[in-house]
C-alpha cells in the first residue's frame, strides 16, 4: 500500500504538491474548471494542517518559446484563489532565486503556485524526460511531496517520479484524488461486485487492446461500440462499407473474439451516412446490411436496447469511450442511450474512465448519477490494462 496524505506529518512543513491543472483554455479564460475543483479537498487538507503549500502542474504542451504566452498557469492561480477564497501567490518561474526566496518566505496556511512544469521542456524536454537534476532540484524546495495528479500518473516525469525519488524515504504520499481513482478503478477491475459489465468505445482497437485483454479475464461481458466495432465486424466477415477500420488489427480482433467465449458483445445495427458530417442524410441498418458506399457513425437503436439489457443486470460498470461520433448530434444517440442506461442503475458501482465518455456524461447532466468519473484519460486506460503507474509506484510505501 502506498502512503496517503493522512499518513504524513504536515505541521509547519513545506508541502510540494503535483496537481493536474491541465484545464481547457480559450482566449486566456478557463472553459472547464473541473480539474481544479477535484483537487480542492487535498489542498484544503494541507492548509488545515498548518502547512506551507507549493503547487505545480503542467498545462498543455510547450514546444516553442511562443507557446509560453498561452500556456501560463497565471489564470489557473487566479481561479484557484477565487475557489479557495484566499490569496494564491503566483511565481512565473520554474526555478531560480525568485522562486526559492518566495518559498522560503511562505508562512503556514499560505499557498504558492509556480509556473507550468513543461516550460522546462523547451531546453531538452527536462520535465517530460524526467531529468534527474531537475527532479532533485524541485525536491530540494520542500520537505514532503504529495502527488494528486492522476492524469499524468502513467508518465514518469520530473514533477512526479523525479521529486518522489529525491524527497527522501517516507516523505511522499498520494493525495485524496489519486487515492479515490486507485480505489474505485482498482476495486472495479480486481474485486468487482458481479456482474461486471465493461463498455468500450472510441475509434481505435489499437488504443484498447490491452484493456480488452485484461478485462477478458475479469469482466462478465464486454460491450463494444464506437468506430472500433467495425474492425471486429470485418473480422467476423461482415461488409462494413466505407466505415473506419484498422486492417492491420483484423487478425488480432479475430483472436480476441475467439478467446472471448462469447464475452464480447458486438452491435447488431448501425447508423450510416455517405460522409463524415452531421448535416447529411442518415439511416439505420443491421450490421449485415451495410452498403458498400456508406459508413457507420453510431450504434443503432436495437444495439442500445441490447446493451441496456446487459447493463440492467450489472453490479459494476466500467465505461470508456463514446459509442459514435458524439460531437455530431445525429450520431450522438448511441452514446446518450448508453449513458442513460448506466445513469438509471441504482444498485451498482458505475465508473467512467475519463476522456470523451466523461465529457459526454457531464454535458448530458448525468455526472452526479455515476459513482466515479475519472480525471485521467490515458492513466485510467493504463490502469484498466493492469499496468503499473510510474507516478504512483514512486510514492513511499506505508
UniProtKB/Swiss-Prot annotation:
Pathway: Carbohydrate degradation; glycolysis; pyruvate from D-glyceraldehyde 3-phosphate: step 2/5. It is an enzyme of class 2 (transferase). Its EC number is 2.7.2.3. It holds the Pfam family PGK. Keywords: ATP-binding, Cytoplasm, Glycolysis, Kinase, Nucleotide-binding, Transferase. GO terms for biological process: gluconeogenesis; glycolytic process. It catalyses: (2R)-3-phosphoglycerate + ATP = (2R)-3-phospho-glyceroyl phosphate + ADP. It is found in: Cytoplasm. Substrate binds at residues 20-22, 35, 58-61, 118, 155. Monomer. PANTHER family: PHOSPHOGLYCERATE KINASE, PHOSPHOGLYCERATE KINASE 1, CHLOROPLASTIC-RELATED. Belongs to the phosphoglycerate kinase family. This is Phosphoglycerate kinase. It comes from Fusobacterium nucleatum subsp. nucleatum (strain ATCC 25586 / DSM 15643 / BCRC 10681 / CIP 101130 / JCM 8532 / KCTC 2640 / LMG 13131 / VPI 4355).
